[in-house]
Amino acid sequence: MSHVELQPGFDFQQAGKEVLAIERECLAELDQYINQNFTLACEKMFWCKGKVVVMGMGKSGHIGRKMAATFASTGTPSFFVHPGEAAHGDLGMVTPQDVVIAISNSGESSEITALIPVLKRLHVPLICITGRPESSMARAADVHLCVKVAKEACPLGLAPTSSTTATLVMGDALAVALLKARGFTAEDFALSHPGGALGRKLLLRVNDIMHTGDEIPHVKKTASLRDALLEVTRKNLGMTVICDDNMMIEGIFTDGDLRRVFDMGVDVRQLSIADVMTPGGIRVRPGILAVEALNLMQSRHITSVMVADGDHLLGVLHMHDLLRAGVV
């Protein structure tokens, strides 16, 4: 394309708004295609014993990849297969237990129509998403989902715009309808997103990140305040637990308690930890979610908390541990 000068006064915002208006109109019309065929497609996918295999060429392929990823992360096992690669061996990934979703706006993708006889021979259920109910793919499908649009947002009518948006939204409608039908929960979602922020919040538990063993700051009730302070500084958690030989909790002493001791104006050299500790103390169970511990710590304005089974000390959790784990 040769260099073109920008037209004086060209309004980019208006051009963008025109696209949104056209695509909004097309999506509103899509509602009529959420019909009995949509129900049949959902039922085939719901009862599928294998995986939902999505296919598409070009822009439809890009939409198909996103569709498969959305299905997979919302409780419907799925993957994308490129039709060209399927014709050269990758079709071996498809079994009669699977369901195939083939996407083509024209419904005449030669790469896909070439695969249909084989899919039929394998008795693989076929759902086709096209913009033309009279197309070859629509007629060959066990279930046809229509995504016909009045016009593309591209003024030339060439670049897939409204049609790809409609297809993407139809895929989202399938995914979310199935999600609801399965009773899919946020915890289920987290299992397929362990590396994300949501996964960390819904999967990570206190016992995954707490300090244990020699890392736990603790002294006996008979210890001097000086010895307790040394333990606080050695373990660097801003606190120490006071417990007996069996690690049964008797109290806690934090850097906040130390400030209060100084405010008392007493001779700290003469004090035992029993004189200044807070009896009992807040503790959490090791099996609770890390985000639950975070909420507790924030509500109580504390930076560390004991982890215990009843009165038996198991570990200590500090706010820094939650930060490092990405929970905060």
Curated annotation (Swiss-Prot):
Subunit structure: Homotetramer.
Annotated source species: Escherichia coli (strain K12)
GO biological process: keto-3-deoxy-D-manno-octulosonic acid biosynthetic process; protein homotetramerization
Protein family according to the UniProt entry: Belongs to the SIS family. GutQ/KpsF subfamily.
Keywords, in A-Z order: Carbohydrate metabolism, CBS domain, Isomerase, Lipopolysaccharide biosynthesis, Metal-binding, Repeat, Zinc
Ranges of residues in domain SIS: 42-184
Positions of the CBS domain: 210-268, 277-328
Pathway, per record: Carbohydrate biosynthesis; 3-deoxy-D-manno-octulosonate biosynthesis; 3-deoxy-D-manno-octulosonate from D-ribulose 5-phosphate: step 1/3; Bacterial outer membrane biogenesis; lipopolysaccharide biosynthesis
Residues that hold substrate according to the record: 75-76, 82, 88, 114-123, 148-150, 222, 275
SUPFAM superfamilies: SIS domain (SSF53697)
Recorded effect of pH on activity: Optimum pH is 8.4.
Positions contributing to Zn(2+) binding: H82
Catalytic activity: D-arabinose 5-phosphate = D-ribulose 5-phosphate
Site positions (Catalytically relevant): K59, E111, E152, H193
Major enzyme class: isomerase
Outcome of swapping E152A: Shows 19% of residual activity compared to the wild-type. It is able to support growth
One Gene Ontology term of the molecular function aspect: identical protein binding
Entries under InterPro entries matching the protein: CBS_dom, CBS_dom_sf, GutQ/KpsF_isomerases, KdsD/KpsF-type, SIS_dom, SIS_dom_sf, SIS_Kpsf
Stated role: Involved in the biosynthesis of 3-deoxy-D-manno-octulosonate (KDO), a unique 8-carbon sugar component of lipopolysaccharides (LPSs). KdsD is not essential in the KDO biosynthesis and can be substituted by GutQ. Catalyzes the reversible aldol-ketol isomerization between D-ribulose 5-phosphate (Ru5P) and D-arabinose 5-phosphate (A5P).
Activity regulation field: Completely inhibited by 10 uM of nickel, copper, cadmium and mercury ions. Inhibited by zinc with an IC(50) of 1-3 uM. Metal ion inhibition may be a mechanism to control activity in vivo.
Identification of the protein by name: Arabinose 5-phosphate isomerase KdsD
Lineage: Bacteria, Pseudomonadati, Pseudomonadota, Gammaproteobacteria, Enterobacterales
EC number: 5.3.1.13
